[in-house]
Amino acid sequence: VAASKRLQPTFSRFSGHSADFMSVFFTHVAVGSRNPVKVAAVRAVLARIQPAIRLESVEVASGVPDQPMGDAETQRGARQRAQAALQQTGAECAIGLEGGVVLLPDGSMRSCAWAVVVDRSGREGMGGSLSMPLPDMVAARIRAGEELGHAMDALAQTVGTKHGRGAVGILTAGLIDRQGAYEPMISYALAPWLAPAWYEPPAVARD
């Protein structure tokens, strides 16, 4: 009796300079935000893949509160930004980025951030980052109704935190800024396109 077995796909190493890889990657990508930090983070990641990729930024609604609460709500905001950007442009894929906060069982609070990538075939990728404990004084202001960025502006006596170094830049004393924290999660969300053989259903052969 013939037995079926799954064929393992052939994998290749991505060096960032593969002509074969570039021929199947996107040439036009949209990002669902005009926030300069978000746009710069996407641009930096795409430049490591293919400098010639066209990036279009569009202002879209996230469909969630200005201060998302919890990973699920933050993910939903990122997804809805990506979907709206795809609908509003002629891009082949779109990226949505959303930052939020998570209330933990012990009453403390942490930050979170998510990236969602969608393309016109319906494929989706998601990546998360920025799980960082928030000081009690920051958490208290968020519980009172402030956004994280506005709370940081008030406490650090600055302006435009979320359009610059971000809360993470202040709370890590500049060790990493918001753009630097966003770049890894964008890379994670692109994994299904960067290494598609790992994500496609394996072929089945029969002896």
Stretches with model-predicted labels:
Residues 1-3, 19-20:
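Acidic, Ala/Val/Gly-enriched low-complexity intrinsically disordered segments
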Residues 6-9:
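Cationic, low-complexity basic patches in intrinsically disordered or flexible, solvent-exposed regions
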Residues 11-14, 21:
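Aromatic (phenylalanine/tyrosine) cluster motif
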Residues 15, 31, 95-98:
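Short glycine-rich loop/turn motifs that provide flexible caps or phosphate-binding loops at active sites
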Residues 19-22, 121:
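Intrinsic disorder/low-complexity detector
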Residues 22-91:
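N-terminal polybasic phosphate/anion-binding patch
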Residues 67-207:
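Anionic-ligand binding patches
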